[in-house]
Amino acid sequence: MVLDDLGTSLRSSLDKLQGKSRLSESDVEEIVKEIQRSLLSADVDVSLVMELSDSIKTRALEEEPPGGTTAKDHVLKIVYEEMVELVGDSTELPLENQTILLAGLQGSGKTTSAAKMAWWFSKKGLRPAVIQTDTFRPGAYDQAKQMCERAEVDFYGDPDNDDPVAIAREGLEATADADVHIVDTAGRHALEDDLIAEIEEIERAVDPDRSLLVLDAAIGQGAKEQARQFEKSIGIEGVMITKLDGTAKGGGALTAVNETDSSIAFLGTGETVQDIERFEPSGFISRLLGMGDLKQLSERVERAMAEAQEEDEDWDPEDMLQGEFTLKDMKRQMDAMNRMGPLDQVMDMIPGMGGGMMDQLPDDAMDVTQDRMRRFERIMDSMTDEELEQPRVVGQSRTERIARGSGTDEETVRQLLEQHSMMEQTISQFQGMGEGDMQRMMKKMGGGEGGGLGDMMGGGKGPF
């Protein structure tokens, strides 16, 4: 994920305080220099870096740590609070009737972002509509229409009309029944006069409740001037940062937020319409520092389970705690997990599993794990209902047949069966447990004992 390098660097800096109970001035000087290097490497504006590091230094030297608090935890708390202050509050987006205007350069991800936002509002119970006004870029209409079809939201565009202002007006009329209108505009490769003039005309025509600037996370220092120009022409109330699943540095986008005196509204975390997060500053910085984000995790779990149950109304996840745990249950679990997004993003949300633990894993650990899950899914697709319901009937001849049918090998089939057996044993231990017992079991699983999340990452035979 974007800013991963920044997170790794910050965590590495803080680890140097491990074992210290008190901080000397030289300790603070060294940690502040490390933080400055980390932020500058991530393309955060120099003035912001100095402001942030000065605040951290002052607080670290002047504030007395609470009793029993280590130097590392004390500085971690200060860094967390100051970085939350740096990124600011989330953009206010009431769940009510509104018109949102999107601005940004070509390639920033506006069209994809429009469909993602519409999908997000639809999941909140509103009826959104996307109005595509980009007459400059070939294929913009087709892309927007396809993305909105995937998001299952209303769409308006007119490929035969070359007047973006007229399209915007007609779009508002044609989608009058919608609660939320998201107006996508054309971009250019640079901040050209005709781009600014066009978006100012559209802004006057649609009279948006708020205008959002869409920024590619890789933009770097160029974000500052871009943000300033759009702020001057239409006023920017919030920012959507796109392509956060890439390896970009991301600091430029944070600089743009500060430059426009606005805030971050959404994060784009992948290529599908579901890969969007409402920005929550505390959770975002918490993940960056390896502290997890349980709120975002619970939202993803809830959404994934609901979608899985929509497709299979007979399945209730709670049934696994009541009776047998079959391969069908395991397959449904894996499907729900896939719906939660890339595995590395999910792991970052789990306290104790992201951050430092992820830093210790090989770079390809997530890819290897997801590849293994895909092979397991192919194997289960090659099984009969009887085999999925009663894995113990799978003997040597069936193993050979399943391996051939799935394009895998017999060893991988046996690994799947072993994995199922391990998970079955773990789940059976939950049956009849009270809440306190379950919490202790989850902690044990997280440490890599008994087929839990720790094992998933290579702590043992582990799931997947």
From Swiss-Prot:
Q: Name one GO molecular function term.
A: GTPase activity
Which residues are listed for GTP binding in this entry?
Answer: 104-111, 184-188, 242-245
Q: Does the keyword rRNA processing apply?
A: no
Q: Which UniProt keywords apply?
A: Cytoplasm, GTP-binding, Hydrolase, Nucleotide-binding, Ribonucleoprotein, RNA-binding, Signal recognition particle
Q: Which Enzyme Commission numbers does its entry carry?
A: 3.6.5.4
Uppermost EC category: hydrolase
Q: Which domain of life is it from?
A: Archaea
Q: Where in the cell is it found?
A: Cytoplasm
Q: Which GO terms describe its biological process?
A: SRP-dependent cotranslational protein targeting to membrane
For this protein, the record's InterPro entries field holds: AAA+_ATPase, P-loop_NTPase, Signal_recog_part_SRP54_M_sf, Signal_recog_particl_SRP54_hlx, Signal_recog_particle_SRP54_M, SRP/SRP_N, SRP54, SRP54_GTPase_dom
Q: Which reaction does it catalyse?
A: GTP + H2O = GDP + phosphate + H(+)
Q: Which GO terms describe its cellular component?
A: signal recognition particle
Note the CDD domains from the entry: SRP54_G (cd17875)
HAMAP family linked: SRP54
Q: Per the similarity annotation, which family is this?
A: Belongs to the GTP-binding SRP family. SRP54 subfamily.
UniProt note: domains: Composed of three domains: the N-terminal N domain, which is responsible for interactions with the ribosome, the central G domain, which binds GTP, and the C-terminal M domain, which binds the RNA and the signal sequence of the RNC.
Assembly:
Part of the signal recognition particle protein translocation system, which is composed of SRP and FtsY. Archaeal SRP consists of a 7S RNA molecule of 300 nucleotides and two protein subunits: SRP54 and SRP19.
User: What is the protein's known function?
Assistant: Involved in targeting and insertion of nascent membrane proteins into the cytoplasmic membrane. Binds to the hydrophobic signal sequence of the ribosome-nascent chain (RNC) as it emerges from the ribosomes. The SRP-RNC complex is then targeted to the cytoplasmic membrane where it interacts with the SRP receptor FtsY.
Q: What is this protein called?
A: Signal recognition particle 54 kDa protein
Q: Which gene encodes it?
A: srp54
